[in-house]
A protein has these predicted regions:
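Blade-edge motifs of beta-propeller repeat domains
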Residues: 1-5, 43-55, 179
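Extracytoplasmic/secretory soluble proteins
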Residues: 36-38, 57-59, 96-100
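Acidic, small-residue rich beta-repeat scaffolds with periodic aromatic anchors
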Residues: 67-179
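Beta-propeller blade termini
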Residues: 7-16, 54-63
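Loop/turn residues immediately N-terminal
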Residues: 30-35, 74-77
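Beta-propeller blade repeat segments, especially FG-GAP/WD-type strand-to-loop junctions
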Residues: 33-48, 82
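Acidic/hydrophobic-patterned starts of short beta strands in beta-sheet-rich repeat architectures
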Residues: 17-28, 62-67
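A glycine-rich, hydrophobic loop/mini-helix early in the fold
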Residues: 3, 7-10, 22
């Protein structure tokens, strides 16, 4: 990867659930959430880590919204809140798509919601109602934009301005990035 990718790494510190314990959010400068940590008994606790096909965003309540994909036929949307004390996250809702069902020559998407740990079939309209209620911002970049606009997180770069300038300058000299 080129040097400008690592320069976008940073963090934010905020009490996401209002329990008096700050969480550490690792994220990029465009607010793509990479990982969320809390502290319990003086030790860091990883609450979640995320990547391109399994992304997350944080809303104004401090809730964590995950969007994942296991391929074209399967998707998952989940919403969590951080438990008081920060030791874990609690599932508020999970729903998604679970493959297709063929009836004749037509494939129909199968929708589900999680109830007591089990995937329960739901209708398309129920799926879209859950989607509207919990995940209005689908997709990796839309989620990052939602985190930026609604979470009240403040990005802090891992690098100083001088380090960023030097890395960018060296990358230009090596022809790794164009200006």
């Amino acid at each position: 990867t080129s040097p400008h990718h690592k320069l976008s790494c940073g963090y934010a510190i905020k009490d996401l659930n209002g329990d008096g314990v700050d969480e550490l959010v690792l994220l990029t400068d465009d607010y793509m959430v990479c990982a969320i940590f809390s502290i319990t008994d003086g030790k860091p606790i990883l609450l979640g880590n995320y990547r391109t096909r399994h992304s997350a965003w944080i809303d104004e309540k401090g809730w964590i919204h995950e969007n994942g994909s296991g391929g074209a036929d399967n998707s998952m949307n989940a919403v969590y809140k951080i438990a008081d004390g920060g030791a874990s996250i609690e599932l508020i809702a999970e729903f998604g798509t679970n493959g297709h069902e063929w009836i004749g020559d037509t494939a129909y998407t199968k929708y589900y919601k999680l109830v007591n740990g089990e995937k329960v079939s739901i209708t398309e309209s129920e799926y879209f109602a859950l989607n509207e209620q919990y995940t209005k911002y689908l997709g990796t970049h839309a989620g990052a934009e939602a985190t930026k606009n609604y979470s009240n997180l403040t990005f802090i770069s891992l690098y100083t301005e001088a380090e960023i300038a030097m890395e960018m300058y060296e990358a230009v000299l090596k022809n790794e990035i164009k200006v």
